[in-house]
């Protein structure tokens, strides 16, 4: 009987320790890349200033990426419409973002992590547009 109680207490302790230390099995945020964007742009109906940005994937956020302006200390969650397959995964590149330019406004369209295979489609714009790529050097 005492051995069953000891085994049960050991099992409960093994399950409880991660919660006591705040490690409930969730992974920490993953920084996917940094880019210096030289112009203001629109994302999720919000205008963002030019500056240095980092893109972070946080577990538990589902299909969202966090876009963080490192200078202004502001951030916004961006919905991922779909994943984009890399056409040449062997080619090395820095993190890059793609913008759709419509008239004089630029809209965030895609994000590609540094040296990773797949990208993220973040926005779709209708009508005539021009693509502009900003890549981390």
What are these regions (language model features)?
Residues 1-9:
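Bacterial N-terminal signal peptides that target proteins for export
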Residues 9-18:
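Bacterial N-terminal signal peptides
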Residues 51-55:
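A short tyrosine-centered beta-strand micro-motif
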Residues 81-137:
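Beta-strand-rich cores of mature extracytoplasmic or soluble domains
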């Amino acid at each position: 009987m005492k051995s069953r109680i000891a085994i049960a207490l050991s099992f409960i302790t093994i399950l409880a320790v991660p919660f006591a230390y705040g490690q409930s099995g969730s992974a920490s945020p993953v920084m996917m890349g940094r880019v210096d964007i030289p112009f203001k742009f629109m994302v999720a109906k919000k205008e963002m200033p030019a500056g240095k940005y980092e893109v972070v994937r946080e577990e538990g956020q589902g299909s969202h990426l966090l876009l963080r302006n490192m200078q202004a200390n502001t951030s916004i969650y961006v919905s991922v419409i779909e994943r984009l397959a890399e056409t040449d995964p062997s080619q090395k590149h820095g993190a890059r973002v793609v913008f759709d330019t419509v008239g004089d406004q630029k809209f965030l369209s895609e994000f590609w992590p540094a040296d990773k295979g797949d990208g993220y489609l973040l926005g779709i714009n209708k009508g005539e547009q021009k693509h502009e790529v900003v890549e981390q050097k």
